[in-house]
Amino acid sequence: MATNTYVALDKITVGSAVASVTFSSIPSGYTDLVIIGNLGTTSGSANIAMQVGNGSIDTGSNYSFTNVNGDGSSAASSRASNQAQIYIDYSAYPTTTLTSTYIWQVQNYSNATTYKTVLGRSNTASRGTNATVGLWRSTSAINTIKLDTQSTTFLSGSTFSLYGISNAGDATPKATGGVYLTTNTAGAGAGTNVFATSVTDILDYSNVNKNK
């Protein structure tokens, strides 16, 4: 049976304009995290930045990122290292209406032995699309995430939904019964077809012989 891989963990809805939103006490029982934002800002000309941490937000110069963006007629790219945050949109800012969509994926967030990678995508109808890959240079597990407008505020009604991504495991269908055709390879019946009536018959050669 299929299992849900996206598990809703939290949702923040901005009631009145705020400069940032923070998810804290994020549980560790998932593989990745995904945040989906539907948002706008009061200025329409500010980057959206991400900072993460363990117990508290890391504000040090421990982030780097590479960004590409395009609007259908031109494209650009940029990269920066030793930053205090990861910019997700860099140049195609959100608008002053609730029409900008952002998706952040934080990979292996609870792993305590590797640096953490963030994949970001944003889409603003009048300003194009962005894709970003960022890095937090820390082996600490992540349990708090902050999204910041840098110099303005998120509009009232902006939403941020946090999901945990779990490993769905092996969903490959497996046989549990039925009729199978096999071929004897030894003894007096070598080369003859044998009908086995169950998986047990296939796995147990003595049962297959009984059905000759």
What feature does the model see in each segment?
Residues 2-212:
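Surface-exposed molecular-recognition determinants
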